[in-house]
Amino acid sequence: MNESIDSGFLLPQNVGAERLAKQLGGESHCRIGESTEFSLRFFDSFDWRLHAAGLRCLQLRAPQGALVKLKPAEGGAPLDAVAYAPELAWPADLPDSRLRTEVAKRLDMRVLLPLATVRGEATDLSVLNEDEKTVVRLQLLTMRVEAEGLEEARTLWPRLRLVPVTGYQRDLDKLTTYLSEEMEWPQSPDCLFDEVMAAAGREPGDYSSKLNVRLRPDQTAADATRTILRDLLATLERNISGTRADLDSEFLHDLRVATRRTRSALSQIKQVLPEELVTDFKQRFAWLGQVTGPVRDLDVFLLELPRYRASLPGSMAGDLDGLEDLLRNAHGK
């Protein structure tokens, strides 16, 4: 299957390969070929760093193999594509390529996480002329979206790709006009990403560690305080599972930042909340900061270790292996 699946036309849900072939003139003018299954998975960091940079990272699996692509958000040709079958995680694991460089530069210390998976079937069709020569190749794509939080897969609108055949541009133009003007089928969006995210119930950029609350001039101090503290609590809670799973060091970092900001808010916003309540929760959040501190210290040491190695003569770089083992063993306890 051609890895470019996000261009062409959107079809009604009830148009399958046989009906499409009939609409294009029947068996003598449109021949149905093989069908193949494929999957497509979108990736980004937990805090949407690739999205913020206007990039999309995806992994396509088809009978021909597995391919990772980095594309501009507005669609079009990929910036780079590399063959890579393992599940995506750390950019450093990717083959040496522009793709790895670009992704690593944006993600820094963050890991790639799956956003949603598209599973589908691609059916090849051939449009024939009077001499039974193929003048346009078609791919009918039926797809469904799977994602964490969805009880069942959600079906996307079928897509029809038009693949040009050398020497038959006029036939391609004629068919394109027929599908858009006679059938009134809309052009598919240049990027599948937005449709997949909507089906998965995700909003790109729906997480940021930055405090972002809207306070109204007519709010009471108590209401404003609750708004701030609820936002901080939401940030803290969203980072708990990633911290426990040790997906990357930024989950714990963001959890601790939200903790410190909560303690600061409790200290600086005075005479709004009951004093005994403030005292109680200041102690609770102080405890949270204390118990997570040692692990964060280990994270910082491990993040800085490559820089420490680079500062040593080449013959001495391996001398830090024992320190790294010690830090990782302590981190895993």
Language-model features: locations:
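Cationic, histidine-enriched alpha-helical/coil surfaces that engage anionic ligands
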Residues: 1-333
